[in-house]
């Protein structure tokens, strides 16, 4: 089993979503789907991690978006 964990933080609000998949291909598809949205997001902080069910991190990415001046 593989887990995809998504964390969003905007001001004082935090959202944490966890998805589980039976195979790695489906999990990686979800991981990259979240990344494509996170790259363009206006949420202050956006993270996504792909883990095994034993807790081993396969890949992880974290975006910090700052307000444009």
Region annotations inferred by a language model:
Residues 1-17, 43-45:
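Short aromatic-glycine-(Arg/Gly/Cys) micro-motifs in beta-strand/loop hairpins
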Residues 8, 22, 51-52:
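A structural detector for beta-sheet-dominated domains
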Residues 36-69:
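Short, mixed-charge low-complexity intrinsically disordered segments
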Residues 1-7, 30, 34, 49:
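Broad hydrophobic/π-residue packing in well-ordered secondary structure
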Residues 13-29:
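A short, exposed loop/beta-hairpin motif centered on an aromatic-Gly-Thr core
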Residues 2, 19-21, 31, 62-63:
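Aromatic side chains
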Residues 24, 33-38:
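Conserved short hydrophobic interaction patches
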């Amino acid at each position: 089993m593989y887990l995809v964990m998504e964390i969003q933080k905007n001001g004082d609000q935090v959202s944490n979503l966890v998805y589980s998949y039976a195979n790695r291909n489906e999990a990686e598809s979800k991981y990259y789907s979240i990344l494509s949205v996170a790259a363009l997001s206006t949420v202050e902080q956006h993270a996504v991690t792909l883990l095994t069910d034993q807790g081993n991190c396969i890949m992880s990415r974290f975006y910090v978006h700052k307000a444009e001046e």
